């Protein structure tokens, strides 16, 4: 069977996402669509609006055949490393295609990735590795979806087993839009509306609306006490070991945390021209979850949800060594220790029946 992979967050799943899955299947004529999805914390360095299991259930009910998880340490990383993990998983699963939304689908993504790679080397020589890495994550250069597309092309070119990249015209609002003006809206606008209990119903499929209404919605403010405690009991030396905390940023954080009464207030105090909100949020998430800089080492992915076609694909492609259907103690210690830590903290503010196996969709609507 030929599979088309889609790397996503679905935070939350909206009409634009459903269109993407439909087009991915239609354009590639793939036998099944695999979604490679962030877990309970997402790439902007914040908790997902609803838990990963419910988002995976929605994806399966809205066009995906198989949903697997990007481990937390990569899901909350820069666009470059987020893409690295997604492409790596897609290749390990034997996907033939990688489809993604783009504002400029005619862009030569492979050529752009080579240009960006050269610019990275130049910036790294002049400044440092951390500052240069922002180039692969810079939405001031172009839209975030195209930045991701370029990073997909970059990592795809590094592999012996390349995927066929399928950029698809994006049918959704700009990710920076904060208002909902119709049936197509940005995920950030929908999150804001859901948290403020204002109207967003026409912008999401029924399955997603049901999930949002029934779930405990989360935001960074739910984790403020945990983060505050972590910072107040940490030394600058300890924070320097945390991924993304460099160039004295640990001192700035510790100087401002006891002057802040909320997560939002701390973010406003920490923001500078050099430190964007997203970069700060990622650093704070790494602090909360005690994520330290380590070499890239992604060997397995966790199965979150599947239908019958997805189960057949896993069996026929002999993916048992790559896809964890049951997570063992050894897996948690070696492959999923950080993800388990993230899930345990998330559960404290958004209770869910953890420990269960993946969601299996039968031939009936769930």
Curated annotation (Swiss-Prot):
Keywords: ATP-binding, Cytoplasm, Ligase, Nucleotide-binding, RNA-binding, tRNA processing, tRNA-binding. ATP binds at residues 7-20, 101, 145, 170. The keyword Kinase does not apply. Gene3D superfamilies: HUPs (3.40.50.620). One of its GO terms (molecular function) is ATP binding. GO terms for biological process: tRNA modification. Catalyzes the formation of N(4)-acetylcytidine (ac(4)C) at the wobble position of elongator tRNA(Met), using acetate and ATP as substrates. First activates an acetate ion to form acetyladenylate (Ac-AMP) and then transfers the acetyl group to tRNA to form ac(4)C34. Belongs to the TmcAL family. This is tRNA(Met) cytidine acetate ligase. It comes from Pediococcus pentosaceus (strain ATCC 25745 / CCUG 21536 / LMG 10740 / 183-1w).
